[in-house]
């Protein structure tokens, strides 16, 4: 930024007054108890990063809007939401430390219908959805 403030933000999505601030994590595999734990630890750390980045964005919102060529309106109450974008499906759809962890399918599905089935069973050649991410 012109002010000299800086932060590496992996994902910024703006929809009206709603702004998602994301930390992206590339996690290769979770094939053992140890790698499962490491994945959770990585994602837990990513939630802290996402929150820090959302705070940075909030503290520098006018300058960031100017940098992106967006019109900043001080009368609008912008809602900033930290999110962790996970390349691996594990933990996607569930929050860690109150921050949603999503993969590309959950994110795409959210914008198409705002719900995503998480738990489904197949009976009589039909899927019955038992749990959703909303």
Protein language model features and the residues they cover:
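Intrinsically disordered, low-complexity Ser/Thr/Pro/Gly-rich regulatory segments
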Residues: 1-134
């Amino acid at each position: 930024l012109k002010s000299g403030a800086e932060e590496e933000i992996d994902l910024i999505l703006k929809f009206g007054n709603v702004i998602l601030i994301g930390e992206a994590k590339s996690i290769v595999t979770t094939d053992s108890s140890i790698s499962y734990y490491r994945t959770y630890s990585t994602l837990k750390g990513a939630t802290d990063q996402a929150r820090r980045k959302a705070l940075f964005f909030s503290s520098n919102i006018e300058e960031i809007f100017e940098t992106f060529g967006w019109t900043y309106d001080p009368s609008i109450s912008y809602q900033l939401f930290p999110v962790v974008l996970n390349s691996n499906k594990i933990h996607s759809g569930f929050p860690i430390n109150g921050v949603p962890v999503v993969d590309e399918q959950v994110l795409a599905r959210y914008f198409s219908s705002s719900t995503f089935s998480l738990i489904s069973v197949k009976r009589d050649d039909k899927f019955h959805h038992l749990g959703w991410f909303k």
